[in-house]
Amino acid sequence: MPPKKQAQAGGSKKAEQKKKEKIIEDKTFGLKNKKGAKQQKFIKAVTHQVKFGQQNPRQVAQSEAEKKLKKDDKKKELQELNELFKPVVAAQKISKGADPKSVVCAFFKQGQCTKGDKCKFSHDLTLERKCEKRSVYIDARDEELEKDTMDNWDEKKLEEVVNKKHGEAEKKKPKTQIVCKHFLEAIENNKYGWFWVCPGGGDICMYRHALPPGFVLKKDKKKEEKEDEISLEDLIERERSALGPNVTKITLESFLAWKKRKRQEKIDKLEQDMERRKADFKAGKALVISGREVFEFRPELVNDDDEEADDTRYTQGTGGDEVDDSVSVNDIDLSLYIPRDVDETGITVASLERFSTYTSDKDENKLSEASGGRAENGERSDLEEDNEREGTENGAIDAVPVDENLFTGEDLDELEEELNTLDLEE
């Protein structure tokens, strides 16, 4: 199969480009970071020579300009197409709780809205003009009254104004400059706006819906207080800078002396206060004193109280039918916990040698010896005890002699025959 020419050509272009970049790197090695004009000019010439060969620089610049023009033409074409065929308008998003009728429909602006009166957004383009910020220091009704002059009235309107101004209802209605509390709450809670209606009757509300001049809201007061506050570090630096250069340097000795002096001053002040209160108490000026101060000023009252106290004890009587469930209570005697010697008369006391001596074995307890066991089974023979006593008397324990001919080969053979001929049923 013959090779693909297009693939070869594409591959050769990439390889050629890599070769050119490699040649440029080799020839300009160590010169890229040089800031001299000659080095930069040399790098530019080498790059141009390797990439474009012996082409004229004017031709290269012309080809680049043509490429740029082509890009600009493409952009212009796209703009014309967008103007002819209007793109899809993105769906509108409004904040939670906002009235959609207060927002102009984006599709209606582009002339693409097909819903008509069913559209939840407004088709009134004049709403955008009403989006200017409303002043909370001006009542809109005052402006309407200023614009509503007598030049525009007819006879019917004039009669209506006269009745309102001089009628009985107007006379009964009190005049006030008090600001509506609902109006203030709406502003404090950021609920005031174009579509806010006063709960006190809307436009019929008798109170003013405008802040008086110089009135400051609570949220603005908090902001001002926060701005006036300074941090603890700034306060310390400010106080320290106000001391000046002529101050005593703080050392351990000076600090301890200052602390001692302050403590003494505090004690002296407390003593002076106590003397003053004592003098007031004696003169009868001190009307409110604590019980502790009474006994401090007149310590003789402590003994008088003990002597003159009424020692009569009162008991609460119980009914005849009730059962006396009295519980005897014994006080704790601390002398019981004092260690002392025990009287051993008439008491059998175990000797301390019980942990080192062993009791004599009985005949019925020698099962381990009969079965060939030794001292590790918990039993000891008389021979072992005698040998142990003799060894302890001599200062050492001798080894027990072992009879090597106790079990000979003949005895073992006889024992095996007896085991084989043993009748298990019996």
Curated annotation (Swiss-Prot):
<feature type="coiled-coil region">
    <location>
        <begin position="218"/>
        <end position="285"/>
    </location>
</feature>
<feature type="region of interest" description="Disordered">
    <location>
        <begin position="53"/>
        <end position="74"/>
    </location>
</feature>
<dbReference type="InterPro" id="IPR036855">
    <property type="entry name" value="Znf_CCCH_sf"/>
</dbReference>
<dbReference type="GO" id="GO:0045296">
    <property type="term" value="F:cadherin binding"/>
</dbReference>
<feature type="modified residue" description="Phosphoserine">
    <location>
        <position position="231"/>
    </location>
</feature>
<keyword id="KW-0677">Repeat</keyword>
<keyword id="KW-0479">Metal-binding</keyword>
<dbReference type="Pfam" id="PF00642">
    <property type="entry name" value="zf-CCCH"/>
</dbReference>
<feature type="region of interest" description="Disordered">
    <location>
        <begin position="358"/>
        <end position="411"/>
    </location>
</feature>
<keyword id="KW-0539">Nucleus</keyword>
<dbReference type="GO" id="GO:0002181">
    <property type="term" value="P:cytoplasmic translation"/>
</dbReference>
<keyword id="KW-0862">Zinc</keyword>
<dbReference type="GO" id="GO:0005634">
    <property type="term" value="C:nucleus"/>
</dbReference>
<feature type="modified residue" description="Phosphoserine">
    <location>
        <position position="381"/>
    </location>
</feature>
<feature type="compositionally biased region" description="Basic and acidic residues">
    <location>
        <begin position="64"/>
        <end position="74"/>
    </location>
</feature>
<feature type="modified residue" description="Phosphoserine">
    <location>
        <position position="351"/>
    </location>
</feature>
<dbReference type="GO" id="GO:0043547">
    <property type="term" value="P:positive regulation of GTPase activity"/>
</dbReference>
<dbReference type="InterPro" id="IPR032378">
    <property type="entry name" value="ZC3H15/TMA46_C"/>
</dbReference>
<dbReference type="GO" id="GO:0005829">
    <property type="term" value="C:cytosol"/>
</dbReference>
<feature type="region of interest" description="Disordered">
    <location>
        <begin position="299"/>
        <end position="326"/>
    </location>
</feature>
<comment type="subunit">
    <text>Interacts with DRG1; this interaction prevents DRG1 poly-ubiquitination and degradation by proteasome. DRG1-ZC3H15/DFRP1 complex co-sediments with polysomes. Associates with microtubules.</text>
</comment>
<feature type="compositionally biased region" description="Polar residues">
    <location>
        <begin position="53"/>
        <end position="62"/>
    </location>
</feature>
<feature type="zinc finger region" description="C3H1-type 1">
    <location>
        <begin position="99"/>
        <end position="126"/>
    </location>
</feature>
<dbReference type="GO" id="GO:0003723">
    <property type="term" value="F:RNA binding"/>
</dbReference>
<feature type="compositionally biased region" description="Low complexity">
    <location>
        <begin position="1"/>
        <end position="12"/>
    </location>
</feature>
<comment type="function">
    <text>Protects DRG1 from proteolytic degradation. Stimulates DRG1 GTPase activity likely by increasing the affinity for the potassium ions.</text>
</comment>
<protein>
    <recommendedName>
        <fullName>Zinc finger CCCH domain-containing protein 15</fullName>
    </recommendedName>
</protein>
<comment type="similarity">
    <text>Belongs to the ZC3H15/TMA46 family.</text>
</comment>
<dbReference type="GO" id="GO:0019221">
    <property type="term" value="P:cytokine-mediated signaling pathway"/>
</dbReference>
<keyword id="KW-0963">Cytoplasm</keyword>
<feature type="zinc finger region" description="C3H1-type 2">
    <location>
        <begin position="174"/>
        <end position="212"/>
    </location>
</feature>
<dbReference type="GO" id="GO:0008270">
    <property type="term" value="F:zinc ion binding"/>
</dbReference>
<dbReference type="Pfam" id="PF16543">
    <property type="entry name" value="DFRP_C"/>
</dbReference>
<feature type="compositionally biased region" description="Basic and acidic residues">
    <location>
        <begin position="13"/>
        <end position="29"/>
    </location>
</feature>
<feature type="region of interest" description="Disordered">
    <location>
        <begin position="1"/>
        <end position="30"/>
    </location>
</feature>
<feature type="coiled-coil region">
    <location>
        <begin position="61"/>
        <end position="86"/>
    </location>
</feature>
<dbReference type="InterPro" id="IPR000571">
    <property type="entry name" value="Znf_CCCH"/>
</dbReference>
<feature type="region of interest" description="Required for interaction with DRG1">
    <location>
        <begin position="236"/>
        <end position="260"/>
    </location>
</feature>
<keyword id="KW-0175">Coiled coil</keyword>
<keyword id="KW-0597">Phosphoprotein</keyword>
<keyword id="KW-0863">Zinc-finger</keyword>
<feature type="modified residue" description="Phosphoserine">
    <location>
        <position position="360"/>
    </location>
</feature>
